Amino acid sequence: MKRFIPHRVIHAVCIGLALVGCRKLDSRAGDFELTIIHINDHHSHLEPEPLELAVAGERLRAAVGGYAALVHEIQRLRAESKNALVLHAGDALIGTLYSTLFRGRADAVLMNHAGFDFFTLGNHEFDNGNEGLKEFLHYLEVPVLSANVVPNAASTLHGLWKPSAIVERAGERIGVIGLDTVKKTVESSSPGKDINFIDEIEAVRRATVEMQQQGVNKIILLSHAGFEKNCEIAQNISGIDVIVSGDTHYLLGDESLGRLGLPVVGEYPRKIMSPAGEPVYVVEAWEYGKCLGELNVVFDRTGVITSAVGMPRFLLHTNTLQKKGADRKNYPLEEAEREALLVALRMTPEIIFAQENDQIISVLEEFKKEKEALGAQAIGVITGASMRGGSVHRVPDAQNPQGSVATRFVAETMLSDIQSFGAGKVDCVIQNAGGARSNIQPGEITYNDAYTLLPFSNTLVLVDVSGAELKQIIEDALQFALGDGSTGAFPYGAGVRYEARQEPDEHGKRVIKLEVQKKDGAWVPVDERAPYRLGVNSYIARGKDGYKTLGEIVSTRGAEDTYLRDAESLIKFLRAHKNFRAYTDSNVIFRLK
């Protein structure tokens, strides 16, 4: 029987056909062409990642990336390019059980197979301290660069990386400078006191001058300083040609990615003029190995870029393609519609149907087997009573006046994690009850238990708020949880406690008393005019679950995503507290009708 293919699908195919072949590199005799292949912030995401796409009026879900596909595509691009550099802009570690269990070994092995020419340090490379970074670098064969992270002579990390390097392609010398973000590494990670950090602009200026003094006129900055800082560097320092960015997890691209419903921040590449009036091109390739950046540039004889074109490449696993229904569930596609959608996707320049490297599949399979075995190992023991969690215990009631003590426990582990880092300061953490998916029973807790309790891979986001805003954030959550929203919004905290009534007063308010905990353990009332640094998970930071005020603050004033995973924080907490006595208090006093 002939299947009906919706007109919108046919229309999407026509648009895709019009886009194919629309990007061309302009070069002349005597020019030098270079292809820069890059990723950043893969955060131990070694397997394909789920991605939602909007195609021809349909919401689709498919898996993209994964190291087996990335390695295949890197090797293909290398083989097809006249001259290529393959670069990683930092934050290889922290984010999945692969990092927790293998402490960088799995990441290093796969990065070696990928054949990166250079890797720069990110802030999360220091999350397990100097020794943790040294262990990762022991397995890593990729040359490491960082011009502004300088271990002293007595440091265990001394001599393990260089500030910069010069490579040759087709007889042309290319300088590559490494750079890390200073503030986040110092304040939100765990570098040793034997590490000196140099201001980003100062370090780049110095390294650029040194390159130029050696006669190098093609310079690439491989920088984990974040997109905004990298644009600032481009505007203030002459001599740099390309900046391969990391840290900010930005997806750059054109309108074709926007039509797919992806969170495009700006164009790829971003063109900025240096103080010398020469172009600098800044690129970044989102996160978690979901895409692979490809930038093709042409240098003239003086080392100035005359042409720069490229895009992020999404390596889509076609056998995972599904349609999302109105109920948010995933459903298989009918064959005719599936084929039409695949044609539309094939005509989108940024979409490549993934092929995988067989050797990487085998290597990763061994790590997966080991991960499954290690996942059943205990990370700590909880003694005392059960800490209630899950959907039944989200809101305190007469039978369970404390509500979700498990959610308070999750918040405490997040607060403990961020307070353990450097000079960073956070006053309190708020966690929504829907994020803690089960009870926490006394006994051994395994790695798998941690990811069962916290399956959403939310990260810890730091937000600066006033006391009045902190109170309103809790009010918003209570209204959503107790009104016409979801009980999953009900707020619990660490370093913060409150008393609230079930029904609002005549002013629509429920909070009766709100306190924060000082470093000496004393509880004091929240000062509505005072500033507080609040930790929240990345889900409610986007204003989800009725956290309207919080979402508005983040979208207008910004926030700092630490990219510390909630499950990782819990694991770290239990490792440090091998026999932890369960909380019996949820930090909430709830007045029923």
Curated annotation (Swiss-Prot):
Example GO BP: nucleotide catabolic process
Primary subcellular site in the record, as a coarse category: membrane
Its membrane topology: Lipid-anchor
Binding site for a divalent metal cation 2: 91, 123, 224
Coiled-coil annotated residue ranges, if any: none
Binding residues annotated for a divalent metal cation 1, in chain numbering: 41, 43, 91
Lipidation feature positions (N-palmitoyl cysteine): 22
Enzyme Commission designation: 3.1.3.5
Lipid-carrying residues in chain (S-diacylglycerol cysteine): 22
Residues the UniProt record annotates as site (Transition state stabilizer): 124, 127
Signal peptide range: 1-21
Pfam family, one: 5_nucleotid_C
Keywords: Cell membrane, Hydrolase, Lipoprotein, Membrane, Metal-binding, Nucleotide-binding, Palmitate, Signal
Catalytic reaction list: a ribonucleoside 5'-phosphate + H2O = a ribonucleoside + phosphate
Family statement: Belongs to the 5'-nucleotidase family.
NCBIfam families: nadN
Protein name: Probable 5'-nucleotidase
Organism per entry: Treponema pallidum (strain Nichols)
